[in-house]
Amino acid sequence: HFCGFETLSAPVRAQLARVADIWQTRLAGDLLGVYLHGSLALGRFAEPVSDLDLLIVTGRRMPRRERLSVAAAVFEADRKPCPLEMSALYIGDLRPWRHPAVCQFHYSGMWSDTYRRLLDGRLKDCFLLDTDFPDDDIACHVRLTRERGVCVFGCPPAKLLPAVPETDFWQSICGGVGTFDLYAYAPRCLPGNLLALVRGLSYKVEKTILSKYDAGL
């Protein structure tokens, strides 16, 4: 059973509200937008298996302590009930558009153990907190959010986010195919990773951004 934003269950809506509050509490007036993309924006969200994919845009850079504070709160909200995946971008890194875009915060299931060790002190340093880092995936996230995204907080995504050139988008969804390691992720991620590769091929043919499910049909 799939759903979109309008048909989300109360627990998932509460989780989304909690995530938005995490960012609003810490960024206040410097939070420009919180947007949903991914399967939810494409109407193929399956509770509680699908990730809640979010893109956050800030009006200033985030210092390390703020990133760690956000990470602690997001870690507690993760999988209650849905897995969370999000990237936070500084608006100054989006305008003018450059590829790969620079990311200043990222959280996903792949990095949850790293954050656990950062939060309990076993790990002292990590690029996720210590640097702004280039991320090839951002081009795909920005374009999907701009075209199909759901606004949770802020202005409509098409007013805030830049247009992503076709060449950058294509490189974003297919650039790592040759070196992609399906088994570098948790076993639960394997079907989704396979379908992500199929989605890239489907875009080449259809020139339309499809969900992983629809691309696999």
Task: Enumerate the language-model features and the residues they cover.
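Helical scaffold of the NTase/Pol beta-like nucleotidyltransferase catalytic core
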Residues: 1-35, 65-66, 71
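Conserved NTP/Mg2+-binding pocket subregion across the NTase superfamily
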Residues: 2-8, 72-187, 194, 200
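Short helix-terminating capping/connector loops at secondary-structure junctions
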Residues: 28-30, 48, 79-82
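Catalytic metal-binding acidic patch
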Residues: 36-73, 83-90
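Short amphipathic alpha-helical segments
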Residues: 192, 196, 214-215
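CN hydrolase (nitrilase-like) catalytic-core segments centered on the catalytic cysteine
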Residues: 198-209
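Short, charged amphipathic alpha-helical segments flanked by flexible coils
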Residues: 208-217
